[in-house]
C-alpha cells in the first residue's frame, strides 16, 4: 500500500534529479526515528515536529507541504468538575495516540515535569479517542479541532476545551544537504506541476490533503521542540 503511494513520486523525482531515487519503508516509529535522526534519508515526508527537528539538526529544507494547518485541542467532558485546566490532567488518564503522534506531543508540551504527566491510554483514531473519553475510559483526550467541531456539534456541548495549541503547518516534504541546493527549487516546482499532482495524488488522498503548496523553513522553525522528550530526538 505504501509503495503504491510513494512509487509515482519516486519515479518523478528520479527523472527530475537525474539519479535513481529509492523508497525506503519503515514499519515502526523506533526504526524510522533512529534512521531519520542519523541522517539516513535525503527526502522525507512527515509532520511539522519532524520537519522542524531536521531543519535545526540535519540542515534539511522543507519544499512543499499540505495546505491546511493543524490545530489540536485537549478536551474533557463538560460536566467534569475535577478538571478545570490542562495542568489538572497530571497523573490522570488521557485517551490518545502513542507519541510521537503530533496531537499527543502538543498535549505533552504543557507538562514540563516528567514526573507530573498524564497517563496515556493508547487509542487509535480520533473518533475512538473522543468516544472513549465520553464513555469515561479516560479523563480527557486530544483531537484536531475539526474533529471536535464534527463530533460536538449540538447546542448543548458535551465537552469543554482545556487547551488549544497554536496552529501549525501541515505535513511537508523536506530535502537534505546531500541534495544540491540548485535542485531544491526544481524538485518543488516539479511536485507542483500537473504531473506532480498526479504523482502525489495517492499520498495526498491518504491524508485528505489538497494540492501541495510551497513550504518555507520559517514556517517550521522551533517545531522540533515538541520532540524534546522523545527517544532519539533529545
Segments (PLM) and residue ranges:
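Stable alpha-helical elements in mature extracytoplasmic
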Residues: 5-9, 28, 32, 40, ...
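Beta->alpha turn/N-cap motifs
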Residues: 25-29, 39-52, 66, 100, ...
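A ligand-binding cleft/hinge motif common to bilobed small-molecule-binding domains
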Residues: 45-57, 108, 132-159, 167
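A structural signal for short loop-to-beta-strand junctions that line the ligand-binding cleft
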Residues: 57-67, 162
Amino acid at each position: 500500500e505504501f509503495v503504491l503511494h510513494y512509487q509515482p513520486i519516486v519515479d518523478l523525482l528520479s527523472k527530475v534529479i537525474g539519479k535513481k531515487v529509492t523508497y525506503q519503508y519503515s514499519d515502526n516509529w523506533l526504526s524510522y526515528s533512529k534512521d531519520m535522526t542519523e541522517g539516513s534519508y535525503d527526502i522525507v515526508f512527515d509532520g511539522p515536529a519532524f520537519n522542524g527537528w531536521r531543519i535545526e539538526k540535519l540542515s534539511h529544507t522543507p519544499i512543499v507541504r499540505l495546505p491546511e494547518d493543524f490545530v489540536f485541542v485537549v478536551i474533557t467532558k463538560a460536566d467534569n468538575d475535577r478538571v478545570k485546566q490542562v495542568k489538572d490532567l497530571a497523573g490522570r488518564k488521557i485517551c490518545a495516540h502513542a507519541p510521537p503522534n503530533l496531537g499527543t506531543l502538543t498535549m505533552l508540551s504543557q507538562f514540563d515535569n516528567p514526573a507530573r504527566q498524564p497517563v496515556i491510554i493508547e487509542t487509535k483514531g480520533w473518533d475512538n479517542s473522543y468516544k472513549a473519553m465520553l464513555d469515561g475510559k479516560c479523563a480527557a483526550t486530544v483531537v484536531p479541532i475539526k474533529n471536535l467541531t464534527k463530533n460536538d456539534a449540538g447546542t448543548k456541548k458535551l465537552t469543554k476545551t482545556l487547551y488549544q495549541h497554536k496552529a501549525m503547518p501541515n505535513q511537508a516534504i523536506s530535502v537534505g544537504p546531500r541534495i544540491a541546493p540548485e535542485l531544491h527549487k526544481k524538485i518543488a516546482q516539479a511536485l507542483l506541476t500537473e504531473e506532480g499532482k498526479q504523482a502525489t495524488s495517492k499520498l495526498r488522498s491518504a491524508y485528505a490533503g489538497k494540492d501541495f503548496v510551497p513550504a518555507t523553513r520559517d514556517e517550521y522553525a522551533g517545531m522540533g521542540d515538541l520532540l524534546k522528550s522523545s527517544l532519539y530526538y533529545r
